[in-house]
Structure formats: structure tokens, C-alpha cells
């Protein structure tokens, strides 16, 4: 039987309080205590901790017919953010999202891809400028997701097939070393499909098809992106049937 220390229990309770507020904005201390079956003093302690870490904030007072109106709490949605980069042959799209998946800012950078030190230097400076303009502090960035046109290893660490960018075998370490935050490759169509799921959480089963200069797609099953053991299940791609076309 797994044993939990007092510290483990406190961390779990703190996490539970935060996630309850995340899912139930404008909730009261009593709401949290009732929902999580913990004491009011315990909730108060965790609220103080989360406020001191600037992860939550008071957002007014709740209406009450008797007595003092209770404080309402919500998370600070941009206390932590994620950066998304779409790497294309001749441009790079960059955006930032908050903890609810809502876009904060976006920009298109005229940075053409090439597997060189010069490219990574340009990209790093462009991302740093984007973060500075939009007041994104380094410590608030949870990580960077890189949407690419190609097949990705199951753990997102390698571009296993990248004919469009001519970068098959490229490692995510090239980006992680440049940005010093966790980075991960994601198939571009899966990025778009995941965005649809964030915006429409009631979707259970669906097929996503991206029609542009290149064909792409993904499949949603039971409300989850279908990836399979190799990370390629549900991926829509095209293939050459006749090299150089028919005569």
C-alpha cells in the first residue's frame, strides 16, 4: 500500500483547491470546503498560499441576504502561459495562450526555416521580442509547442518524417537548447484539432480535415485525439502514386 507523507497530502490539497477554482470561477471559500470535504481553516491556508504565489485573486464578493458577503475567487488566467509556434518553410506564426487556452497575442514572423544556427538565433530573438512586447515574463512560460508539417515521434521529441521542411530526424533539443523551456513537436493538423476540442469540449467523435496547400487531418474518439502507440493513428496525409505525374 502506497504511503503518503503530510507534505504529499498538503500538496494534493493545494492542487485540489486550485483546480476547483479553475473549474469554478467566482467561487467562495465555503464552496471549496464543501466540494472538497475539507475544513475552512485548511481552505483558508491554501487560498493564502495561492494568492501569495499570484496564481489566484479575489474577484469581488458574492451576494448574500444575511451577514457579510463572501469573497469570490478566480485563477489569474495569465499567471502561466504557453507559446505556440507554427514552423512553415517561409514564415513562422507565433501566439500565446492563457491557462484557459484563450489566445493572448499572435504575430506572423518573416522567418524562413533552415536547419542552421542562424535560423535558431533569428527565431530566438523574434520570440524574445514577442514576449517583451506582450509582457510575458520568462518564469510564466510553461513551454513551447511547435506545430510542424510532418510525422512526429510519440513523445514529440523528433521529426521522424519532414519532407516539406527537409528536416527528417530533427531533434526538439535544438529548440529546447535555444529557448531554455520545455519544447515539443506536434503535427500541425493535431494542433488545429486540439484547438477545436478546447473550444468545443462537448465533441465526442469527429474527423478533422485541413484543406490548404497541403492536406492534413486528425480524428477525435471519445473526446480525445486519436494518436495510437506510434503517434500516427488518425493522421491524414497524402502520398505520391506516380512520381513526376502521369505522362
Place the predicted regions along the sequence by residue.
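Short clusters of small/polar residues that mark proteolytic maturation junctions
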Residues: 32, 61, 108, 163-164, ...
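Extreme N-terminal segment that seeds HTH/winged-HTH DNA-binding domains in transcriptional regulators
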Residues: 1-29, 33-34
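Short glycine-rich, Thr/Ser-proximal phosphate-binding strand/loop in the N-terminal lobe
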Residues: 4, 83-117, 159, 232-236, ...
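Conserved phosphate-binding catalytic cores of ATP/NTP-utilizing and phosphoryl-transfer enzymes
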Residues: 58-80, 185-208
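Glycine-rich phosphate-binding loop and adjoining helix at the ATP-binding site
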Residues: 107-205, 242-245
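Glycine-rich phosphate-binding loop of actin/hexokinase-like ATP-binding domains
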Residues: 201-247
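N-terminal helix-turn-helix
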Residues: 26-58, 68
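Gly/Thr-rich phosphate-binding beta-strand-loop-beta motif of the actin/hexokinase/Hsp70
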Residues: 69-106, 208-225
